[in-house]
């Protein structure tokens, strides 16, 4: 909490400008391209991280596909995860976020500007609808982030089981899967300190459709989970 307050304080001048601009970008009639909207948000996020006393170490950026129409599956450690992704991925990302967070100040406008989706984790029909929409949009050339654990891990760098249902969107889109390992992403907001923190984000080699075409969603989920877990163990 102390770091969040510090980040807000360090960006008091810029915050109203960001909120106004991103709110306008979230409107349906906005004329900015998807890349332009994303780049603006990424610049904002990079400043927030820099002035929030966090060093973001990025590895494996060369594994991010140069062509749109892919999905990113990271482990989930907390609120800082999306900041790390927006600050490190040059391709425009949309995200599936829990419904409870979709109404937070600034978050709701960022979601609108990135054309992201909120999902009710207690409503099976809503989950099916969102997963189906993600698959359609990725197939049409958009990029999405889904946290397959369903909720954040409360055990630091340990990761939870990946829910196989989220990978139905992959089967529908027939797209590259980019596993992402987040390391110490829980620390900036969970540790009640303003000491400088180091967060690592590792983009792993993409898993192409040819590799998973004959697999069940449960097998794909386990494969992605294991590759991320192995990368974390190797790096800490």
PLM regions with names:
Residues 43, 47-70:
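A short, well-structured juxtamembrane/interface segment
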Residues 14-15, 19-28, 37-38, 51, ...:
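Catalytic core of membrane glycerolipid acyltransferases/transacylases, capturing the structured
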